[in-house]
Every structure is written in C-alpha cells, then in structure tokens.
C-alpha cells in the first residue's frame, strides 16, 4: 500500500470510530480514487464517503538554517454499515 502511510489515533479519530469512520495519513500526491481503491482492496470493505484535508508542514531549525517538514494529507473514510476494519476497531472495557 504505497498511498496509505498509517492510521491516526487522536481524540477525534477515536470518537469517529463509533460512526464507522477511520482516519489515515496518506501520501500528499495520492488521489481520492486511489485511496478508495487501496482501502477496499486491502481491507475488503466498501467505502461510501471520503473526506480529506491537507495538514501543513512544520518549521524545523537546524542551527542557523530554517527548514521544514513536508505537508501531508489526512483522509477520513466512512464505511458502509456492517463493515469494519478489525485491527482498528475500538475495544470497550
């Protein structure tokens, strides 16, 4: 899976798991259709909606030189009812 970097676990993304929505950081050059195809193929689920936003890079200083990290894209993927991604399911205790 070249386009998907990793799953995101923030307060908001954990709250969205209850709505059957999963959050991933993806390559900034990937398109929505590519990500949808990869998620459906790799996890064996049906995607009904996708939301995305671009997160800006941050400044990093190395001595007198000011650099920056690369920006990246975050996708919130909504699955059809009845489908889930097993390793990302929130366990209730």
From Swiss-Prot:
Keywords: Chloroplast, Plastid, Ribonucleoprotein, Ribosomal protein, RNA-binding, rRNA-binding
Taxonomic superkingdom: Eukaryota
GO biological process assignments: translation
Gene3D superfamilies (UniProt xref): 3.30.70.330
Compartment(s): Plastid, Chloroplast
GO MF: mRNA binding; rRNA binding; structural constituent of ribosome
Annotated family: Belongs to the universal ribosomal protein uL23 family.
UniProt subunit comment: Part of the 50S ribosomal subunit.
Record-given protein name: Large ribosomal subunit protein uL23cz/uL23cy
Species whose genome carries this gene: Coffea arabica
């Amino acid at each position: 899976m070249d386009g998907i970097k990793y799953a995101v676990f923030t307060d908001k993304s954990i709250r969205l798991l209850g709505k059957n929505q999963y959050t991933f950081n993806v390559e900034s050059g990937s398109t929505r259709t590519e990500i949808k195809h990869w998620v459906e193929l790799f996890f064996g689920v049906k995607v009904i909606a996708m939301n995305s936003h671009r997160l800006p890079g941050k400044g990093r200083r190395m001595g007198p030189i000011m650099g920056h990290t690369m920006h990246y894209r975050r996708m919130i993927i909504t699955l059809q009812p009845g489908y889930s991604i097993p390793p990302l399911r929130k366990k209730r205790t």
